[in-house]
């Protein structure tokens, strides 16, 4: 990418704000707002009529990596036609739909460690051979070139050593494939020392319990080549002994805890199997762990355990996985990724099915990664709570009280350390707070402080997932709270942060989740973003022409103001087919500012104000048509002509509704009632969006709609005051006002997200979308906004 620094467009003044990205600057070329955007080209427009100009439904070029090249080559077609891009997107969408529709209990990579535990099960008829020979075949076929087993693409000493030791045990137990076991033993001996310097964050789950058990079994088998007296092994044993003293056996036997997941690590303890068998899931597993279930079967020969083991082997072609089912985890994280990448609209029915499925297994204590686990974790519960609430489900926030202890929130019972991603997911969930939900306020404060502290100390590594850009994702999430998060800004940054298939999940070994970490998701998102971005760039071309022809600058509104207005529209309503809504959003914002500027200008006479209002009424009633400007009322005629052009671009029914909305706003403006611009914008957008089927005129008079309008107007008026102070370089923070805005935003979120009764959910969502743009403008630094404008509208996606 070319040298990036913040664009100083039209000498914009940059001031401090409560939320600001790192001091990254973007120097844009002249083409950012230059003449190239005003050029006409036969390649630029296709047959979409809007306001007597043509705006392309699908723009005919894709922005190049260099901004200068965009200037020079804007009229050149890309090497890859948009038809091919569309086909590629459609093919990938079809693939993802098939993936989501076949998600079943979740797609997860095979685990060498768990397969080895299955291989250790002796023949049920008493013969000296494995009960499941397919596991031995899998182990023999999947040894890596260096003699180890484990994740081939991401190296970690923990993952490789525990997988290799388990597989060596399986081969030596049945005295098969001696050359492979010898090679594995050599690997262990030569690489054991790497544990001394291995990153603790990459330690696999329960390693300090599981590795000693495997070592003991190896020693009992007479595998003497391993240096059992090595300092690192002694250290691991000491850690194990310390941890075992903190595991109360009475609790282990009484209720389902996270310890069950690594129960094979308790092999040498006095376990009461009669009590433990009561903690099985209905599927027969122990906390959805194949290895733990295999361990239990060795001691109990329980039929339900055997049924679960056979199910796993059948599902994964003779091998095992780290954890199964992962049906809830897979569905929730898949939905989250699709939403953040900005492509969820392609999978609405699949997402609906996923969330409906998750809700079926929701309990008052939350959920786990797999159904029927008799155990609940904060990570899945947080993700589930947020997504279900955002999709209209009635969710009780008191579910989080089960994870709170001594002022902190923990993922699993008995957790000794906090997880970065778990805390971040709780933080995201807490931002959907409704009024009076104190537990979510406590959660948000705890999470924000925890994450800020970790960020300040540059400790942004997680114990559950290894993701290349996780630290950047966390920082961006802290800097852009949900109230100020615009869909296209979020998608643009998440495209940078999402690693696709490069994500590695940490269980008792490393595993991959195709439903969650999928390169197809990213490919669709990149192609779609570029496609939409090209469309937005041509719309921006049109908007600049409109700016000139409408004499907007005469009302003190700069081209930069127009750019920000269009950006807010495009960052919120980004889909290619919604050109009309974006244009109307930007125009309505600018025209209302023009009229408001006219009304509040000291030089505007009462006669001129009356002339504007009378002219508008005459125009509505068909008694007057703008034909030419009278010199004594030049500004009045400019405003009437611009407003007439804006309202005349719709069919008769929509135009009638829009004229009424603008009449209401003008009346309020005349009466000195400030802050109704948000209501005007919402109503305009809902009419323009085609909600007129459900958007009957009587809806405007319904109490729910009035409540939403009044609340949105109040919020946006206060946010405008904050934004004006920011522009005027004043920094007199008003904590009382901030708290009032926070409370009102919570009330608005509640009204919008609760299940729709009288008003269509899409109509209500427009109120929140508009309010979020005001929140964004008030609390995000001007310098940061310029970076976002560049990234969303102009910077190519690489």
UniProtKB/Swiss-Prot annotation:
GO BP annotation list: gibberellin biosynthetic process
GO CC field: chloroplast
Disulfide-bond pairs as recorded: none
Residues noted as binding Mg(2+) in the record, renumbered to the chain: 377, 379
Protein name: Peregrinol diphosphate synthase TPS1, chloroplastic
Function: Involved in the biosynthesis of labdane-type diterpenoid including cleroda-dienols, and peregrinol lactones and furan derivatives, dopaminergic diterpenoids that can bind to dopamine receptors in the human pituitary gland, have probably ability to lower prolactin levels, and are used to treat menstrual cycle disorders (e.g. premenstrual syndrome and mastodynia). Terpene synthase that produces peregrinol diphosphate from geranylgeranyl diphosphate (GGPP).
Motif DXDD motif, residue numbers: 377-380
Alphabetical list of SUPFAM superfamilies matching this protein: Terpenoid cyclases/Protein prenyltransferases (SSF48239), Terpenoid synthases (SSF48576)
Domain statement: The Asp-Xaa-Asp-Asp (DXDD) motif is important for the catalytic activity, presumably through binding to Mg(2+).
The organism's taxonomic lineage, starting at the top: Eukaryota, Viridiplantae, Streptophyta, Embryophyta, Tracheophyta
Subcellular location: Plastid, Chloroplast
Pathway named in the protein's UniProt entry: Secondary metabolite biosynthesis; terpenoid biosynthesis
Similarity comment text for this entry: Belongs to the terpene synthase family.
A Gene Ontology molecular function term of the record: isomerase activity
Tissue: Mostly expressed in trichomes of leaves and fruits.
Keyword field: Chloroplast, Isomerase, Lyase, Magnesium, Metal-binding, Plastid, Transit peptide
Cofactor requirements of the protein: Mg(2+)
PANTHER family the record matches: COPAL-8-OL DIPHOSPHATE HYDRATASE, CHLOROPLASTIC (PTHR31739:SF30), ENT-COPALYL DIPHOSPHATE SYNTHASE, CHLOROPLASTIC (PTHR31739)
